[in-house]
């Protein structure tokens, strides 16, 4: 109540911002006559004038009105397009580091030129981030005349470019590119062996197009650069054969396993919300029996024996592949290869692979070639990458529903920009049916009715499978249609260009040509661009034909958007609706749902459908009721809330890794910048040797407790020196713990200096630097794997009444500290034993190391919630802490590691103990 009174008195935050922006727009408009009077040369000279004023101490905000007015006039002269006032308001929001929500067709691309130009005047570079290569190239080409007229350079950053081309693209004042490529370039820059190989400048200012898609939808899938692991296994194929024999256990929500009646019991349960599968007690027994039968386990062994624990990785990967990932929904199979379909856009993602063995399990399921498993070399989430920029902003047509998350995670405020013309699209209420068959019958009838009156339709589906199902229904009804999904995305531009023609029926997955407008009557520009050397008479004839089509479509009601199911996010539904009603055009939208749709089946209570049946609702009866609409919206809010919690949780864990990543990358950068690290090496040697001595000569201990033979042996093996420490102690009674430390360190340093004196100093410095880089890269790679293992199992700490997030922070810090100690010790020891090398041998070694690096693969990880907190909380209440009982003998340091790597325990997971 009080909030409403305050809003009425002072207006909403959005209204107050718009009011402030409108005053600045008035100042920009007032400058228009003055700027219009300038010659081309004088207009171009404004850029140098602005740069000089910046050097003289003026701020960007002081330059803003005049700079924006200059860009508007340049746009008129080069493109024939004049920025609307609402586009300028959008530009002001972007310059202020906010998200501008601008409706589809309102000209976001042109609106971004003003803040891009203004911020590029600093000379630090501006990145304009798009969701795909096509849009990056198109927007750069389209807006380039404005920037180049004003003396600024434009670069395009897309996959497949040579490093020299990328360096040129990043050196440009304004760089267009995809979110993936910007992120991968950042990771690659932190894997180079020479500063000249880096391509990015310090990250200054980014404008993210379709910001909701990049910062929300893709926030759960971190970017990963990986190389092939040393070995792979045919276990995926063998275990794949077992899975179809397993039976799903039928359970009601909240029911415990022991409460399930015998006839409903099975081998596994599914958590579709979190996309996880779990074996039941019966399932463990079934799998064990099948494993023993196939000779993968010995009779009497358990899946959880130390020797078999790695098998669970393959079992769970195969179980998820069979029960939660479907062909033509989550992936397609093309040329004997499994290609992921982006669930948010419907586009194919060639080259991307799911992690944790899931991709190999899907390949085994489909009979495709199983590619080798990968090992992560570098990784970062979009949350942490984009937070590296000094200033960040974004634009989209749909961000308001996610405003809280964008503010909380990124500190980005959403400003809803008014439309240039009033929006007159009619959003009709949902049509809900009991069954999917009844829903599709109603859809066909609706399409037929609108198609016959010449109204174009865009039918939105959630998956390739659903789009092909709708296509079959329409084909059966003899309704001509086009289908746009990941399988035929090559024809996307042509299909979208014709989707606004009278009576056109276009079926599209979520991709729906996002970033391109559906023009009523068809896209005249696209039509003309396909034809060369047209006579003026022919051009006028085609324009007249288009006008007739355009008028006919408007008379029929404009574009009608028909959704075949609700997405789990209201924002995606709004994106689909937004294809219609652009720039004041007429249009309409409506969703057709059934109680068998995934959203309602998983998230809306089952009792709703039971109640409808009890009330006598028939299959083909349509249900329209505010209560149903509220239930659907509530289900969507639940999913949005759950997905936000997952993203927040993943960010909380990734922030830990991010702090460590910054330390490693900073050390690496400093290494590359420095030619002589001999002082650093000396400090590292002193610290590493001192710590090693302390393990044999404990601090503040009696001499009887010292292990001198062990210390001599360790120094001999690791540093290649035979130091008679026992004799020193016999001859010199004044030696104590502190002086012994100093004498050993001095002897090891003296031996190194003697070796150094015989070598070429330049070669020695290069050896030190190269070796440190190699050790840093190797141990960071191993550390990423250890962190991943830790993250996957950390939720189990909840059963011991411990906070998993706190435990993860504590243990990951310990792992990181141990890693740094190992790097220092190995560096000191290896340098001590290293043979003298010439400068040419060092260069040859560097070349060999770089050539031996695995072929890199670029992909997104498939990350899910670690475990719902509610489940852990329940487990905390139900399970009392049990005393630890070792089921297997303790693994010796020189025995094979039980993880199956083939290494000794002390060289594998024993390192982490």
From Swiss-Prot:
It is an enzyme of class 7 (translocase). InterPro entries: Helicase_ATP-bd (IPR014001), Helicase_C-like (IPR001650), P-loop_NTPase (IPR027417), SEC_C_motif (IPR004027), SecA (IPR000185), SecA_CS (IPR020937), SecA_DEAD (IPR011115), SecA_motor_DEAD (IPR014018). PROSITE patterns: SECA (PS01312), SECA_MOTOR_DEAD (PS51196). It is a peripheral membrane protein. ATP binds at residues 87, 105-109, 517. May bind 1 zinc ion per subunit. It catalyses: ATP + H2O + cellular proteinSide 1 = ADP + phosphate + cellular proteinSide 2. The keyword Cell division does not apply. GO terms for molecular function: ATP binding; metal ion binding; protein-exporting ATPase activity. SMART domains: SecA_DEAD (SM00957), SecA_PP_bind (SM00958). Belongs to the SecA family. This is Protein translocase subunit SecA.
């Amino acid at each position: 109540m009080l909030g409403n009174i305050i809003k009425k008195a002072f207006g909403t935050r959005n209204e107050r911002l718009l009011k402030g922006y409108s005053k600045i727009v008035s100042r920009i408009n007032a400058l228009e006559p003055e700027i219009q009077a300038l010659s081309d040369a004088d207009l171009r000279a404004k850029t140098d004038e602005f740069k000089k004023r910046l050097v003289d101490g003026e701020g960007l905000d002081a330059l803003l009105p005049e700079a924006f007015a200059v860009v508007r006039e340049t746009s008129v002269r080069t493109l024939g397009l004049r920025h609307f006032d609402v586009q300028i308001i959008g530009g002001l929001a972007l310059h202020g580091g906010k998200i501008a929500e601008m409706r589809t067709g309102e000209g976001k691309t042109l609106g971004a030129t003003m803040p891009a130009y203004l911020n590029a005047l600093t000379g630090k570079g501006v990145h304009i981030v798009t969701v795909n290569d096509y849009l990056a190239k198109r927007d750069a080409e389209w807006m380039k005349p404005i920037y180049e007229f004003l003396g600024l350079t434009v670069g395009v950053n897309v996959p497949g470019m040579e490093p020299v081309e990328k360096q040129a693209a990043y050196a440009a004042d304004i760089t267009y590119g995809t979110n993936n490529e910007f992120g991968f370039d950042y990771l690659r820059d932190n894997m180079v062996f020479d500063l000249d190989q880096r391509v990015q400048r310090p990250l200054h200012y980014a404008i993210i197009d379709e910001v909701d898609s990049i910062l929300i939808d893709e926030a759960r899938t971190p970017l990963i650069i990986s190389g092939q692991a040393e070995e792979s296994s045919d276990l995926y194929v063998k275990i794949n054969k077992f899975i179809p024999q397993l039976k799903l256990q039928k359970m009601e929500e909240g029911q415990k396993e022991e409460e399930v009646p015998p006839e409903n019991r099975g081998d596994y349960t599914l958590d579709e919300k979190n996309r996880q599968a779990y074996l039941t007690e019966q399932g463990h027994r079934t799998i064990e029996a099948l494993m023993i039968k196939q000779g993968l386990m010995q009779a009497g062994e358990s899946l959880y024996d130390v020797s078999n624990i790695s098998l669970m990785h393959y079992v769970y990967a195969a179980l998820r592949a069979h029960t939660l990932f479907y062909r033509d929904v989550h992936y397609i199979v093309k040329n004997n290869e499994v290609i992921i379909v982006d669930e948010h856009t419907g586009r194919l993602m060639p080259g991307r692979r799911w992690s944790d063995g899931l991709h190999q399990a899907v390949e085994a399921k489909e009979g495709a070639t199983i590619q080798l498993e990968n090992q992560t070399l570098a990784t970062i989430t979009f949350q942490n990458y984009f937070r590296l920029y000094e200033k960040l902003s974004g634009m989209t047509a749909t961000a308001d529903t996610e405003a809280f998350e964008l503010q909380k995670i990124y500190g980005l405020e959403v400003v809803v920009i008014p439309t240039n013309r009033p929006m007159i699209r009619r959003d009709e209420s949902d049509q809900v049916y009991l069954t999917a068959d009844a829903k599709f019958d109603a859809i066909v009838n609706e399409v037929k009715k609108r198609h016959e009156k010449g109204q174009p339709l865009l039918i939105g589906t959630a998956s390739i499978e659903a789009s092909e199902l709708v296509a079959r229904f329409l084909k059966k009804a003899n309704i001509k249609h086009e289908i746009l999904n990941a399988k035929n995305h090559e024809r996307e531009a042509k299909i979208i260009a014709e989707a606004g023609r009278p009576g056109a029926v276009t079926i599209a997955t979520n991709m729906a040509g996002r970033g391109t407008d559906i023009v009523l009557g068809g896209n005249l520009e696209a039509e003309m661009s396909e034809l060369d050397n047209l006579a003026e008479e022919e051009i006028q004839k085609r324009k007249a034909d288009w006008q007739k089509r355009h008028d006919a479509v408007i008379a029929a009601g404009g574009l009608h958007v028909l959704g075949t199911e609700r997405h789990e996010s209201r924002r995606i539904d709004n994106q689909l609706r937004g294809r219609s009603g652009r720039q004041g055009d007429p249009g309409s939208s409506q969703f057709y749902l059934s109680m068998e749709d995934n959203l309602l089946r998983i998230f809306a209570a089952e009792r709703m459908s039971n109640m409808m049946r009890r009330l006598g609702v028939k299959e083909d009866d349509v249900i329209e009721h505010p209560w149903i609409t509220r239930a659907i919206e509530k289900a969507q809010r639940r999913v949005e809330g759950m997905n936000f919690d997952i993203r927040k949780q993943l960010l909380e864990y990734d922030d830990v890794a991010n702090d460590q990543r910054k330390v490693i990358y900073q050390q690496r950068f400093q290494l590359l910048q420095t030619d002589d690290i001999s002082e650093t090496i000396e400090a590292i040697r002193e610290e590493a040797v001192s710590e090693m001595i302390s393990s044999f000569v404990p601090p503040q201990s009696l001499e009887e407790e010292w292990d001198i033979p062990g210390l001599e042996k360790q120094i001999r093996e690791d540093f290649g020196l035979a130091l008679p420490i026992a004799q020193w102690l016999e001859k010199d009674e004044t030696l104590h713990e502190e002086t012994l430390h100093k004498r050993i360190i001095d002897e090891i340093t003296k031996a190194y200096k003697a070796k150094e004196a015989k070598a070429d100093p330049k070669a020695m410095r290069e050896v030190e630097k190269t070796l440190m880089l190699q050790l840093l890269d190797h141990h960071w790679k191993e550390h990423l794997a250890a962190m991943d293992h830790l993250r996957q199992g950390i939720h189990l700490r909840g059963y011991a009444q411990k906070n998993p997030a706190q435990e993860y922070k504590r243990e990951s810090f310990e792992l990181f500290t141990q890693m740094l100690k190992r790097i220092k010790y190995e560096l000191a020891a290896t340098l001590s034993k290293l043979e003298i090398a010439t400068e040419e041998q060092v260069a040859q070694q560097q070349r060999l190391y770089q050539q031996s690096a695995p072929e890199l693969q670029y992909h997104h990880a498939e990350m899910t919630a670690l475990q719902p907190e509610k489940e852990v909380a329940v487990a905390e209440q139900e399970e009392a802490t049990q005393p630890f009982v070792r089921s297997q003998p303790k693994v010796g340091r020189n025995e094979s590691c039980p993880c199956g790597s083939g290494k000794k325990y002390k060289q594998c997971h024993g390192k982490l103990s």
